[in-house]
Each structure stands twice: as C-alpha cells, then as structure tokens.
Amino acid sequence: MKWTKLAAAVGLLTVFSVPQAMADKLDDIIASGVLRCAVVLDFPPMGSRDADNNPVGFDVDTCNDLAKALGVTAEIVETPFPERIPALISGRVDVGVASTSDTLERAKTVGFSIPYFAFTFNVVTRKDAGVDSYESLKGHKVGSTSGTYEAIRLEKDVTNWADPAGGFQAFQSQADVFLALSQGQIDGTAVTSTVAYATAADPNFSNLMVGGAAPYDIDYVSLITLRQEYGMINYLNLFVNQQVRTGRYKELFNKWIGPGEPPNLLIPGAYY
C-alpha cells in the first residue's frame, strides 16, 4: 500500500511538473503578449529615429514582423552595440534584432538564427584627412564601435601595420565614432556599406565621405536569443526563411536600403 501511494504521488508530481519543464521563452513571449527586441538605433538604415523620435529602420520593421507572426506586440528596446548580449543575459530583452555577426565566440553565450542580412564594408573618412582607400588608413588614428565585427578587424590590422603614427580607439556607439571623426579626433573608420553611404549623404556630416571598400569578408548577421532556448531558435530560423520566400525580405531591403536585389543569404557549400 505504501509503495502504491508513493508511486501515485510520484506520478502526480511528474504530471504537474511537465508543463513547467516544457515552458520556454517562446511560450513566455506568447503568454505575455509582448516581444522585447534589442535594436541598435544609431545604425541607419537598420535602426534609427525619425523626426518624431520614433524607432525606424530595417531591424525595427523586422522586429515588428516577428511580433506580428507571434501574435504579440513589439517593444523596441534601444540597445547600443556593446550591450546586445548583456541585454539578453540580464533578461531586459527576449531577442536581439541588432545586426549581430554570427561568431563562434558569441555562440558560447547566445543562440543564433540563420542569417537574416549580410553586409559588405567601406571606409568613411573626413574629406581633409588624406584617406582615399583602406590601405591609406595606415599611419592614421582610426576608430570603431566596441564589440563589432569591423572593430575587431580594424584593430587587428592597425596592430599588424605597426605604424607608430597610427592607432585604434574603441567607442561605445556608432554616433560617437562619427562625431569623433567629424571633429578630427580620428581620421577614419570602417563601417557597413549601408551605413557608409547613409552617413555620407547626411547633411549633419557634410565633411565626411566614403573612402573606398574595406577588404573584409561578408558579414552575415543573425537574430539572437539565449543559447538554451531551442524552441525560440527554431522559430527564428523559420521566421527568417518565411521573410525571404514571401518576398518580405526584398520588400524591406528596397524600403530602407535599395533599390535592387538584397544580399544573398545563401552561403556556398553550407547548409543555409
């Protein structure tokens, strides 16, 4: 009798514990009715603010599309580049729609979707800095946004150039980089092509120009969430797939970046 009662008790505990064990981030988001997206808002045309201070851009629309697919309301959480992963880990956001490069080092901490966008890179410099190519950055003070793919690559190249007249400085935001560049604190930076041409056309930075291509690999960027949230990662993968095959990816590209064909997200010889 005692064993029968014990078995029944264990069975009840198992039954009542299963829903809790199976609950995950995807369930939590749907239950809460809100999707909190980390978005970088000083990175046009991916993310910025309009004249009325409303968040706008490719990443903002992507977050809104994801929330719509989930049947919840989107909440844009402005997040500087260095804070994207900390915002996830601390629970301030549910996902990052923040142009995050899918590096193996970051994958130790967060989970990545398949790529939802891909970037090439250009130099941005001041018109009077004497820089007209990536190679001509050698011997100049340069800078980039801390924690980004281009910052890691640019700092590495400055170290390899070993020119005592040169140097690298990290900044907390893209806006800080362009302010320092326009004021003469640095002479150049490397940024995504989308940002480079948007900045050169910005009347607030009339003394800046595009200074040629940066010889970096294509930067594939992904949506991010906590690495253990397999259900959420699977959903994000299917969401990106749907964005492409329904034509929404191309539509957003032409709205914010184009006109033309958006970057190919297929990686030769890989499974996506």
Regions found by a protein language model. Name each.
Residues 17-23:
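Sec/Tat signal peptide C-region and signal peptidase I cleavage site
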Residues 23-99:
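Extracytoplasmic small-molecule ligand-binding "clamshell" domains
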Residues 38-43, 77-82, 91-103, 119, ...:
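Beta->alpha turn/N-cap motifs
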Residues 41, 117-125, 201-238, 259-272:
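Periplasmic-binding protein-like
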Residues 63-72, 150-170, 200-205:
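Ligand-binding cleft/hinge of the Venus flytrap
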Residues 68-69, 77-78, 82-96, 109-111, ...:
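Short helices/loops that flank or line small-molecule/ion binding pockets
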Residues 83, 100-108, 153-157, 182, ...:
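A ligand-binding cleft/hinge motif common to bilobed small-molecule-binding domains
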Residues 125-142:
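Flexible hinge/capping segments at coil-to-helix
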